[in-house]
């Protein structure tokens, strides 16, 4: 069943006439055309009969025509009201309720004479949750490039270098491999600074005998990777190395349990129980992982409260961590494809 067919099914389920999609990544997912319109209207209308209409600034029309999108295009000037160019009466409209602003909703009421709204967010999340072979190949390449980033960063480590210098070196060097954009702000944290799970790289200088935490990802043809490695520089303290071994055991055990039909919360419990049994439960303050695709964090989450089941075609992260102030912060993260038989680890830098 195609993506559009799934939306039409949801329109029928909710007795709605059309769906209105405005999140740029979701529009790209359905059309193959990517735009960042800022304040301008950029939206895809999917009607119950399968017709698709893309609203975009007139200056982008030729780009849309060159894209895979084959539906109708409504291009508008900045001085025009887009709705006046495509007059419609839509009794019930499905929207991305988590994203659509009140101002845009008012425009829809007046522009399309909408009487009521429904939600299409969950349907889109469920579609994006299961990756196609093409999407998987792009994520696999993004993961390969993330491995390269770690390699670049580790090779640059030397006593006295700052966190910020290592970040800059990684992001400049990886451009030689065709990477134009990182998935998120690259994180490099030294020693006990890594005890802040989302710390900001700064001017802290690397000292002998401490761990270095790398958390990074790249975007390849719109798809993200996201991986973390914690690397020894010299011989860290006995407690820091003990923490590392516990995190590695938790991650390995959780990954080995992945297969279709297993509740996501069970995977979280496996890692969390190992860390708790070793006395560090209070120092693992976040969920075990999350979905990965067009965004570095997307549906679904790997958490203790998510009873949904793993399915073949999902790509998730597994990233346990222990963060002890004044001692060390250790996190290890891999990107995992759920396969029919079990799993495939997409990130490969040594641990």
UniProtKB/Swiss-Prot annotation:
Mn(2+) 2 binds at residues 215, 226, 333. The keyword Protease does not apply. PROSITE patterns: PROLINE_PEPTIDASE. The keyword Cell membrane does not apply. Pfam families: Creatinase_N, Peptidase_M24. Its cofactor is Mn(2+). Mn(2+) 1 binds at residues 226, 290, 319, 333. Its EC number is 3.4.-.-. It comes from the Bacteria. Binds 2 manganese ions per subunit. GO terms for molecular function: hydrolase activity; metal ion binding. Keywords: Hydrolase, Manganese, Metal-binding. Belongs to the peptidase M24B family. PANTHER family: AMINOPEPTIDASE (PTHR46112), DIPEPTIDASE YKVY-RELATED (PTHR46112:SF10). This is Uncharacterized peptidase MW1651. It comes from Staphylococcus aureus (strain MW2).
């Amino acid at each position: 069943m195609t993506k559009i067919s799934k939306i039409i099914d949801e329109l029928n389920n909710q007795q709605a006439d059309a769906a209105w999609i405005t999140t740029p990544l979701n529009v790209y997912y359905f059309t193959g055309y990517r735009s960042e319109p800022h304040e301008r209207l950029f939206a895809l209308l999917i009607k119950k009969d399968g017709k698709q209409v893309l609203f975009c600034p007139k200056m982008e029309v030729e780009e849309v025509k060159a894209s895979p999108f084959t539906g109708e295009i409504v291009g508008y000037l900045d001085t025009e009201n887009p709705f006046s160019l495509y007059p419609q009466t839509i009794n019930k409209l499905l929207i991305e309720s988590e994203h659509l602003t009140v101002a845009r909703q008012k425009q829809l009421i007046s522009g399309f004479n909408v009487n009521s709204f429904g939600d299409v967010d969950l349907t889109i999340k469920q579609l994006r949750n299961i990756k196609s072979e093409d999407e998987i190949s792009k994520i696999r390449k993004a993961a390969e490039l993330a491995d390269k980033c770690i390699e670049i960063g580790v090779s640059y480590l030397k006593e006295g270098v700052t966190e910020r210098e290592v970040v800059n070196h990684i992001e400049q060097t990886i451009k030689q491999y065709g990477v134009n954009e990182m998935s998120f702000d690259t994180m490099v944290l030294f020693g006990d600074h890594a005890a802040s799970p989302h710390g900001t790289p700064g001017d802290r200088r690397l000292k002998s005998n401490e761990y270095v935490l790398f958390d990074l990802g790249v975007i390849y043809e719109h798809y993200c990777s996201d991986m973390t490695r914690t690397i020894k520089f010299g011989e860290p303290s006995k407690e820091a190395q003990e923490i590392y071994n516990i995190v590695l055991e938790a991650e390995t055990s959780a990954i080995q349990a992945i297969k279709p039909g297993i509740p996501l919360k069970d995977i979280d419990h496996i890692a969390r129980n190992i860390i708790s049994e070793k006395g560090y439960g209070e120092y693992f303050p976040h969920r075990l992982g999350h979905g990965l695709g067009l965004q570095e964090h997307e549906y679904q989450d790997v958490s203790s409260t998510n009873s949904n089941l793993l399915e073949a075609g999902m790509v998730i992260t597994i990233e346990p961590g222990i963060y002890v102030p004044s001692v060390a912060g250790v996190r290890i993260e891999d990107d995992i494809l759920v396969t029919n038989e079990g799993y495939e680890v997409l990130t490969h830098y040594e641990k």
